[in-house]
């Protein structure tokens, strides 16, 4: 049942004490027009190598941004820069050594928080699949998951796009691995939000699938909001977490109280289901979640597993369809049967570079449930590691 564990855990190695202090003066985003910045991403990392030429390194990255500060030693250099392309920056720095402790903050998003009139912040991790326009519209704050191909480290949806991820998934010699955001990432997010919001709700992957919930909880214990703060287990993944987040975000927009929000969250989680169909089991097998023998047997029998989240937060098969032809047509009928005679408020459809199938599903479900809000999004890279190319997920939120 290795396929049931969605996320791997990981720890950042402790670094020896070195002088990595920056003399630069931080920008006050309250006093500048952040939207007009040419280089909106405040980016930091550690470069570990042999005899790192810091002056040359500085000149190399100069065209990529401004506010450059490099500190440390010849073997460990900490880099700070404001850039518009963190991915290219990290790729460039990798020519000087191993890039670790990547950190990227979007100053435009921080500025929106400063200007927001809301009193309650909503935080999710990047496994919550929602279209970017909905995340921005409802001021939903995202802490990204980490992933790596061998020694190449990436920040989910920040330093690797979906297109880049799936290209690497198909061609890299290394099958990617994921790790939950470290507590420091959550703590930095919470500390910033505590200066601009009275309360926070942080919604994450099931505790039994990932250490994300635990890391978020550990970080929040060290930050104090003026009114209320809580971590919620979504008991869902991907678009399932997405529809729950949307319900809470709309309630926050309507100034619902914190106790009412937590009650609403419990009810919404109970009313949410997600179903996932994999085009192939290749990613599952390569990731060590399914033995070669079991994969061969499933393929030989022509079985298509349909996965879902149990009430305990476990990802398990909830059914099968038969025959390798028209997999997603059969999956569509499976989900429609599950939803038969039920009143549906929201439907989230996600895909792993399978947009045509996702759009076809959208048309079908909009026709079947004309009163429901329907959205389409990509499977984030952190989940694409396990779902693989072509996967389709459908989340249903019942009234």
Language-model region placement:
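Short beta-strand segments
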Residues: 124, 202-206, 233, 395
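Mixed-charge interfacial surface used for oligomerization/domain docking
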Residues: 1-76, 110, 114-117, 127, ...
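Short amphipathic alpha-helices in soluble, non-transmembrane regions
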Residues: 56-63, 89-97
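Helix N-cap motif at beta-to-alpha junctions
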Residues: 50-51, 83-87
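A generic structural motif
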Residues: 75-84
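N-terminal glycine-rich anion-binding loop in soluble enzyme alpha/beta folds
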Residues: 121-185
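Conserved short beta-strand edge segments in small beta-sheet-based binding/regulatory domains
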Residues: 70-72, 94-111
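Active-site cofactor/cluster-binding pocket
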Residues: 181-216, 220, 224
């Amino acid at each position: 049942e290795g396929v049931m564990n969605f996320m791997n855990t990981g720890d950042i190695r402790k670094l020896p004490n070195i002088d990595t202090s920056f003399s630069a003066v931080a920008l006050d985003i309250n006093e500048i027009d952040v939207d007009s910045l040419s280089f909106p991403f405040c980016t930091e990392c550690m470069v570990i190598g042999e005899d790192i030429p810091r002056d040359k390194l500085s000149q190399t990255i100069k065209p990529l941004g401004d506010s450059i500060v490099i500190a440390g030693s010849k073997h460990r250099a900490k880099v700070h820069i404001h850039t518009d392309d963190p991915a290219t920056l990290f790729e460039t720095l990798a020519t000087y050594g191993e890039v670790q402790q990547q950190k990227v903050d979007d100053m435009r998003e921080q500025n929106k928080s400063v200007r927001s009139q809301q009193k309650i912040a909503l935080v999710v991790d990047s496994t919550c699949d929602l279209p970017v326009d909905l995340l921005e519209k409802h001021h939903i704050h995202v802490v990204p998951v980490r992933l790596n191909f061998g020694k190449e480290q990436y920040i989910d949806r920040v330093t690797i796009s979906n297109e880049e991820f799936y290209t690497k998934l198909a061609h890299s010699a290394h099958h990617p691995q994921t790790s939950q955001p470290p507590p420091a990432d959550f703590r930095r997010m919470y500390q910033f939000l505590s200066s601009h919001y009275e309360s926070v709700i942080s919604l994450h992957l099931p505790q039994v699938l990932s250490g994300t919930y635990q890391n978020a909880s550990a970080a929040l214990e060290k930050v104090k909001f003026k009114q209320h703060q809580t971590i919620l287990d979504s008991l869902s993944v991907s678009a399932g977490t997405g529809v729950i987040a949307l319900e809470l975000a709309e309630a926050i927009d309507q100034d619902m109280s914190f106790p009412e929000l937590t009650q609403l969250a419990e009810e919404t989680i109970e009313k949410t289901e997600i179903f996932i169909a994999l085009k192939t089991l290749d990613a599952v097998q390569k990731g060590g979640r399914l033995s070669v023998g079991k994969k061969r047997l499933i393929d030989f029998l022509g079985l298509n597993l349909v996965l879902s989240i149990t009430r305990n937060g476990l990802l398990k098969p909830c059914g099968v369809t038969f025959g390798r032809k028209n997999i997603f047509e059969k999956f569509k009928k499976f989900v429609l049967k599950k939803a038969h005679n039920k009143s549906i408020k929201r439907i989230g459809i996600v895909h792993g570079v399978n947009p045509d199938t996702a759009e076809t599903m959208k048309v079908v479900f909009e026709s079947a449930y004309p009163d429901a809000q329907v959205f389409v999004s990509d499977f984030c890279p952190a989940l694409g590691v396990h779902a693989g190319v072509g996967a389709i997920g459908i989340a249903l939120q019942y009234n």
